[in-house]
Amino acid sequence: MLADDWTSLRDVQYRKIHLYDLDWAEDEDRHLDRCLVVVAKYGGAVAMVRDETKLLKMSAKDSIVPTLRVCNCAGGTISETRLDKAVQAPGTASERGRLLTMGWTDGEMLVMVRERGGVEVRDIMGELSKTLELVDDSSRRSSEPDRVEACEVWGDGVVALMGSGKVKAVSGIHSSEPRHFSMAAGLGAHAAPLTAMAVLEPQFTASGALEVVLATEDGNVLGAT
């Protein structure tokens, strides 16, 4: 065993052990630096889709419509689903914009959040289960509609920082009627840019409620409850 296999973290020593290569290792379509990639807890499913926020070189065989790929932890394909950018919530006619982020819930549902506030909830086979909206109708119809600036998916929902400085949250995402609510964070539309956001789930907080910690570029750390 070589000494350079080990890395020090304060007074703890650890090393990485190579177990196996994922099945997609030679697949040009699955280069991780081109994709948004999220992994479910405890060695669960891996979801990946082309990162629409990056400027990527595409070949003639590439489709403009992104494909959502769900794999097992060894890289074996579970499902592939072409994503229609214009998936709409009932009663709305606007597109949802680029995909900003996605994540797995505790119930292994994939939550996909778009920049204009549209949320898609899909199962492990990529089938659309439900759609939600983080932007209300009045804002959507205004000349400067609110947008999602940053977002985190947690075990039972999603939390988003909007361009207006509001923090919006959804809980009970697995239920037939998820709960939508706003959280007070003290951020305005002209606050310093966000540098980090962490979601503290109810089972881990003293209050027993969902809490969010926000850090801004000017060194402020704010809590939203």
Model-derived features: positions:
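WD40-like beta-propeller blades
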Residues: 1-225
